[in-house]
Design a protein with these regions (language model features):
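Conserved SAM-binding strand-loop segment of SAM-dependent methyltransferases
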Residues: 7-20
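A short acidic, Gly/Pro-enriched loop at the edge of an enzyme's catalytic core
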Residues: 19-30
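C-terminal helical/coil "lid" or tail adjacent to the Rossmann-like core of SAM-dependent
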Residues: 120-178
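Core SAM-dependent methyltransferase catalytic element
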Residues: 114-117, 134, 138-143, 184-194
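Conserved catalytic/acceptor-binding region of the Class I
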Residues: 44-45, 51, 59-132, 148
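A short SAM/SAH-binding and catalytic strip from SAM-dependent methyltransferases
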Residues: 29-44, 66-68
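Conserved SAM-binding loop
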Residues: 2
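Helix-to-beta-strand junctions that scaffold the AdoMet/dcAdoMet cofactor pocket
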Residues: 40-41, 54-56
Length: 194
């Protein structure tokens, strides 16, 4: 709502590549990201650039995913694909992607190296839910996340793809309550001072 009427809230909104955008030095009083920072090719450079854009003493805040083992939305589909295909799948590590900052120590070190202070990483246990049908949810899981990556790695036949999809549908039915399909989730809520 605020973006559709920025004049009414006295705020400017900027959508840009934080790694390469030439920001006005200390031009912002706050930097916020919701699950976007994990995709930087060079996180150190990106966080340095963000820090230069935030007024001294002001904050950067973001949320990102905790480890795969604490996130059913990633782990459950991955396990399903591994069980059905037998594919060997290694965790993605620090490469750009949803779990790039799932290692708290690594995340903390990147922010400190980029010269942020008062780095705080809170662990938040929550859940994520969708009102999608079990079929639509299964289709989504076939296209994103760790299950999708394992599918790409396994390169299964159409018959095996259908088996995976049906397993996703069955899992969705087990998770569905009151019209919602839910997954346990753990995220990091991060704040750091420029």
């Amino acid at each position: 709502l605020a973006r559709s009427h920025p004049e009414s809230v006295g705020k400017d909104f900027l959508q840009a590549d934080a790694q390469s955008c030439k920001f006005e030095p200390e031009g912002f009083d706050l930097a916020i990201s919701r699950f976007g920072v994990m995709f930087f090719e060079n996180p150190f450079k990106a966080f340095q650039n963000i820090k230069s854009a935030v007024q001294k003493g002001r904050e950067m805040r973001f949320v990102c995913w905790a480890p795969i083992s604490a996130n059913d939305f990633f782990l459950s589909p991955l396990n399903t694909v591994v069980d059905i295909t037998g594919v060997s799948f290694a965790e993605p590590g620090k490469e750009p992607g949803p779990l790039a900052f799932s290692d708290r120590t690594y995340l903390y070190s990147i922010l400190k190296t980029a010269e942020f202070s008062s780095v705080n990483i809170d662990v938040i246990e929550t859940s994520i839910s969708t009102k999608d049908s079990v079929e639509k949810n299964a289709s989504l899981l076939m296209e994103i996340g760790m299950g999708f990556r394992a599918i790409k790695e396994a390169a299964p036949t159409d018959e095996v793809l259908n088996e995976i999809r049906e397993a996703f549908v069955a899992d969705g039915k087990k998770r569905q309550k009151n019209g919602l399909i839910s997954y346990d989730a753990t995220i990091y809520r991060v704040s750091a001072v420029a």
